[in-house]
Design a protein with these regions (language model features):
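Positively charged n-region of N-terminal signal peptides that target proteins for export
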Residues: 1-4
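Bacterial N-terminal signal peptides
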Residues: 7-16
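Cyclophilin-like peptidyl-prolyl cis-trans isomerases
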Residues: 21-259
């Protein structure tokens, strides 16, 4: 079991450091979004194919437009994100390349803490998660506050952003001083969709929760956390997708063992 680096300024949030997000207690602040750092993988995978270009992160480094939009289709409905590259250029470029190659398609919104954040960005497919585990990008300066509806990368420490994103469900200005740099914003009507994401699991998850998602993919979440919402697709608005490389073969996920 790996240990995840905590992202908190502990005195601010009042939690001890640990391997995974601490369970929030009524009246206390929730832990800041953190990202998995484990390189371990497994054989479970969702029943769909992925763009094999995602297995080579070093090749996906196109510069994003100054502004662009991404349409999300989810199990709760649709919303649109507008990205402003000047807010966080490195993060905006990474997000652009991930969306172009459909990284977020079929991914679950695996962490939703009421009144705090909705977090996603662990691939439905273990081989893809494995490929991006060490594909870190450098931090951007924080030029925008973590306001309600703003999108920001989760991290596991300085210069460790990879693929995980969170949407602020309220104004979380306390995250600004910790280096969380927003790069986009959900349209106002779309926030009604985001606020419907299933949130009753909260942070009541195992210490190795993200590790299990990384190793087993969506198969694990569907078996153990079946009420989670997911992203059916995330696509660039008004821009054709790049020519897809041969898709990975479908693999049947192993039967989940009872807890």
């Amino acid at each position: 079991m790996r240990k995840l680096a905590t992202l908190l300024v502990m005195a601010m949030f009042g939690f001890a450091a640990g391997a995974h997000a601490q369970t929030p207690v009524t009246g206390q602040s929730s832990t800041a979004p953190k990202a998995s750092t484990s390189p371990k993988t497994g054989t479970g995978t969702a029943h769909a194919a992925y763009d094999r270009a995602l297995l080579r992160p070093t090749m996906l480094k196109d510069k994003a437009p100054d502004t662009y939009q991404v349409k999300f289709v989810t199990t709760r409905g649709e919303f649109t994100v507008t990205v402003t590259r000047a807010w966080a250029p490195t993060g905006a470029d990474r997000f652009y390349n991930l969306v172009r190659h459909h990284f977020y398609d079929n991914a679950s919104v695996f962490r939703v803490v009421p009144g705090f954040v909705a977090q996603f960005g662990l691939s439905a497919f273990p081989p893809v998660s494995a490929a991006w585990q060490r594909a870190n990008i450098k931090d951007d300066p924080v030029t925008q506050s973590n306001k309600k509806g703003y999108l920001t990368f989760a991290t596991a420490g300085p210069n460790t952003r990879t693929t995980q994103i969170f949407i602020n469900l309220k104004d979380n200005s306390a995250l600004d001083s910790q280096g969380f740099a927003p790069f986009g914003k959900v349209d106002d009507p779309g926030m009604k969709v985001v606020e419907m994401f299933y949130d009753q699991y909260g942070d009541n998850t195992p210490n190795d929760y993200q590790d299990l998602i990384t190793k087993q993919g969506k198969a694990y979440l569907d078996a153990k956390w079946p009420k989670l919402d997911s992203i059916k697709s995330a696509t660039l608005v008004g821009e054709p997708a790049p020519a897809a490389k041969p898709a990975a073969p479908k693999v049947t996920a192993p039967a989940a063992k009872p807890q």
